[in-house]
Amino acid sequence: MISALFSRGADGVPAPAPLDFATLQLPASPNTCLLTPSVAAGQGHLQRDPLPASPEAVMAALDRVAAGMERTYPLARFPARNQAQWVVRSALMNYPDIIVAEAAAVAGGTGLWMYSRSLIGWSDLGVNRARVMAWLEALEAALRAG
């Protein structure tokens, strides 16, 4: 993990793999935030009703959102899962956090799963929750704008 602190962008973080939201087990540490669709069973910290856009449109809008976020770098894309991952670096200490998003058709529209987690430390002082809420707000605005 030390290399993650001295790296830039997406360098230095563990090799990405697709995240299976159906089997995700949240850690005991308070340094994550999971958003799940309100129509899906799960253990999310936050829920969101289905979005009124296709999964592809949601992911395209999320790509635009991520591109506009400071210190955010693409990490991986898994098209078969309609999933993308990014590294977000803290301004002061360069700590890397990972954010994973996946969109899928659900009853009533498109369900969004978003998981933001710290790679270093026990507590994040609410940073991951604030990030998920900010990304969700920006995504909703991007979808409204078309």
Task: Outline where the language-model segments fall.
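Ser/Thr-rich, low-complexity intrinsically disordered terminal regions
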Residues: 2-146
